Amino acid sequence: PALIEKFRQERLSIAGEVAKLSQEVQAFLSDVKTERQKQAQEQATALRXFFLQV
C-alpha cells in the first residue's frame, strides 16, 4: 500500500508539472502571437507610407 500511495503521489506531481508547463507554453505562444501581430501592423503601416510617397 505504501508503494502504491507513493506512485499515486508521483503521478499527481507529474500531472501538476505538465499542467503548469502547458500553461507556460500557452502564455508564451500568446505573447509571440501578440508580438507578431504588432510587427505585422508596423510593417503594413510602413509599406502604406512608402506607397504614398511613390
From Swiss-Prot:
Residue ranges the record marks as coiled coil: none
UniProt xrefs under InterPro entries: Gas-vesicle_GvpC
Entry function: Confers stability, involved in shaping gas vesicles, hollow, gas filled proteinaceous nanostructures. During planktonic growth they allow positioning of the organism at a favorable depth for light or nutrient acquisition.
Sequence repeat spans: 18-50
Family membership: Belongs to the gas vesicle GvpC family.
Keyword list, A-Z: Gas vesicle
Keyword Transferase attributed: no
Presence of keyword DNA repair: no
Any Gene Ontology CC annotation: gas vesicle
One GO term (biological process): gas vesicle organization
UniProt protein name: Gas vesicle protein C
Location in the cell: Gas vesicle
Recorded superkingdom: Bacteria
